[in-house]
Amino acid sequence: MKDFETICVASGVQIVSAPANRFKTNEISISFCTPLSAKTASRNALCANLLARTTKKYPTLSEFNKKLAMLYGASVTCSVAKLGENQLLTLNASSLDDRFSFENDKISVDAFNLLMSMVFDANVDENGLFYPQDIDREKRLLAEKIESEENEKR
């Protein structure tokens, strides 16, 4: 394995990569670390979910999923975790390694660009706010997820 490579993409934002040719998939993650507070914890969880669903270029879930399908079935996930006194929000894209694509498609570049657009070109209105109907949907989905976890018998 090569040494880590670091690329600065914006002020305070760096990409650290560890190239390896032994895997059939690529994993690309973006993490945000924020102070944990009762006031912002649920908002941050909603924000991560909203970012992982659509972008300006792919404003509906259907269009977003179609783009993922075009990337040989790539997937995007988000997670929110407590890390000490901080909250860690992570967006992850998983895609087929370019070596396994037809006609030398650059799947990893497209997956990376999609991940970047989720953060830097989010599906927000002219005031930089998420659309109310999207917020309501994510609140409902998050509440359903929490309820199902509470009701799960282990």
What are the residue ranges of the model-derived segments?
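N-terminal start-of-chain detector that recognizes signal peptides
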Residues: 1-5, 51, 60-66
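N- or domain-start disorder-to-order transition segments that initiate the globular core
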Residues: 1-26
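A short linear-motif detector with a strong N-terminal bias
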Residues: 6-11, 54-56, 68-72
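M16 family metallopeptidases and their MPP-like homologs
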Residues: 18, 24-43, 61-117, 121, ...
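Active-site SXXK
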Residues: 44-53
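Short, polar/flexible loop-turn hinges at active-site or ligand-entry regions and domain interfaces
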Residues: 54-57, 98-102, 121-131
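Short, surface-exposed recognition loops or helix-turn segments adjacent to catalytic cores
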Residues: 127-139, 154
